[in-house]
Amino acid sequence: MRTHRRWIAALAGALVALAGPAALAVESDPLPVPKGAAREQAIVVYNDGVKLMLEKRYPAAQARFEEALARFEGLAEAHNNLAFSLRMQGAHNFDRALKHYDRALELKPDLAQAYMYRGVLFTQTGDLKRASADHARLLRLDRDLAAKLEAVIVSRVVREGNEGLAAQYE
């Protein structure tokens, strides 16, 4: 029996020695990210969309963000910027934009820009209660963006309260 145990121990030691450092690896060790992975490809396309969006070429940006999301649906920033690009093209896109703002926030609940621009969308549609709720969340995430959203909400309230009045003389 002792000979049998020694033989098993020797065999196990030989296997470890032959396998080298790989035998000591742990399952949770990080794996290298392969080039051309879906997320990596999506980010390249997304970055192209950002350039187009900054140039105010919203239909072209929309197409790039949609392509990025087709490659990797889990990119919250692409959902946010797709929603922005849709919103900037007119009210006929507001429902679709809202779905993408909501998805961005599902994926990344602390994405301040999505609260900011969804709040603007709510303001544009007259839903000041939901715009104010997004403003309250922004106060915890990004006070500068919260101030910008507050200005949008206030300007809407002031505009609505003064409809039909003549402009003030300077």
Residue ranges and their predicted role:
Residues 40-67, 71:
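Alpha-helical segment of the N-proximal tetratricopeptide repeat
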Residues 47, 81, 117, 151-152:
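Canonical tetratricopeptide repeat
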Residues 55-67, 89-103, 125-137, 161-165:
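Structural signature of tandem alpha-helical TPR/SEL1-like repeats
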Residues 78, 114, 147-148:
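TPR alpha-solenoid repeat register
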